[in-house]
């Protein structure tokens, strides 16, 4: 059996530049890959570490869809599991009692994605994604 792989963790921040500065200092000066997703009213900064991607997320506008999915509170927001097929994973997880949020699967920041309703046992949002190839950090 292949071990599951956590693709990334998502952290909502109120001030992206301040959060980048703090995380960069913590990670020894590592620079993030930054991008804007205007269709979702999001600014994202990704720190690629040896074993995990830390995704800092800042809302850039009303973000009706993104806020509805992820909520507005700052802090650790979601844990994302990499899967080969979002459709197959949705079926498997539905049988285990996970409920996909309305509007998923869809294209997201990391390829095909699906968010689930907030987990009552952990308080976290879980996301699955079939990641596209990422650019390597310089």
PLM segments and residue spans:
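A short, acidic/glycine-rich surface segment
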Residues: 32-34, 63-67
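A short beta-turn/loop motif at secondary-structure boundaries
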Residues: 37-40, 71, 106-109
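A glycine-rich, hydrophobic loop/mini-helix early in the fold
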Residues: 48-49, 57-62
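Long, hydrophobic N-terminal alpha-helical segment
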Residues: 1-42
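Vicinal oxygen chelate
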Residues: 1-2, 6-14, 45-48, 55, 67-87, 90-138
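Short, conserved charged micro-motifs
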Residues: 18-21, 86-91
């Amino acid at each position: 059996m292949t071990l599951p792989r956590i693709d990334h963790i998502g952290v909502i921040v109120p001030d992206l530049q301040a959060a980048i500065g703090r995380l960069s200092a913590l990670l020894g000066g590592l620079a993030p890959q930054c991008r804007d997703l205007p269709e979702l009213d999001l600014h994202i900064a990704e720190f690629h570490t040896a074993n995990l991607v830390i995704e800092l997320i800042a809302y850039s506008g009303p973000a009706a869809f993104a806020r509805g999915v992820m909520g507005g509170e700052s802090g650790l927001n979601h844990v994302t599991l990499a899967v080969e097929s979002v459709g197959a994973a949705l079926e498997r997880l539905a049988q285990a009692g996970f409920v996909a949020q309305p509007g998923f699967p869809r294209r997201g920041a990391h390829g095909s994605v699906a968010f689930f309703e907030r987990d009552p046992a952990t308080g976290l949002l879980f996301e699955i994604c079939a990641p596209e190839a990422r650019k390597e950090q310089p």
